[in-house]
UniProtKB/Swiss-Prot annotation:
Keywords: Calcium, Cleavage on pair of basic residues, Disulfide bond, Hydrolase, Lipid degradation, Lipid metabolism, Metal-binding, Secreted, Signal, Toxin, Zymogen. InterPro entries: PLipase_A2_dom, PLipase_A2_dom_sf, PLipase_A2_His_AS. This is Phospholipase A2 phospholipin. Heterodimer composed of a small subunit and a large subunit; disulfid-linked. It is found in: Secreted. Residues 124-128 form a propeptide. Its EC number is 3.1.1.4. One of its GO terms (biological process) is phospholipid metabolic process.
Length: 145
């Protein structure tokens, strides 16, 4: 819970970088509580994405160190986020909301293009389940790799 609070608190300087019409899409969040969402369907995707397994900048986890300036997430989370944004786009009725969602998706996966990691268990199962206590991770250029 401490990690979640640290990750979601964000700095006040980063608050102006929040994606339009959202409370969870950007550095940290500006929601009053877990159920506080902006009007875009994509905000639900961002909230879920914010709670994903991650390796913070400078942190070592699963045998790898994140030397990048930004937090990196598990590739499963990145794939789920991309899929969720596509579904959010399809649910939106207003053209402006569709456009904002598509721009968010294009920015995140096109411009920002985050690297991610895959956790593997010694038994070769994909990590983060109850039976994988000592998972080992490897970096990927994208969840699509």
């Amino acid at each position: 819970m401490v990690d979640l609070a640290r990750r979601c608190s964000g700095s006040t300087e980063g608050r102006f970088l929040m994606w339009e019409c959202t409370k969870w899409c950007g550095p940290g969040n500006n929601a009053k509580c877990e159920s506080d969402l902006g009007p875009l369907e994509a905000d639900k995707c961002c909230r879920t994405h914010d709670h994903c397994d991650y390796i913070a900048s400078g942190e070592t986890k699963y045998g790898i160190t994140n030397y990048a300036f930004f937090t990196k997430l598990n590739c499963k989370c990145e794939e789920a986020f991309d899929r969720c944004l596509t579904e959010a786009y399809n649910k939106e009725e207003k053209e402006s909301a569709k456009s904002s969602t598509k721009r968010l998706q294009n920015f995140y996966f096109g411009t920002y293009s985050p690297e991610c990691y895959v956790v593997t268990c010694n038994s070769k199962r994909s990590g983060r389940d109850a039976g994988c206590e000592n998972g080992v991770a490897t970096w990927k250029k994208s969840y699509k790799d």
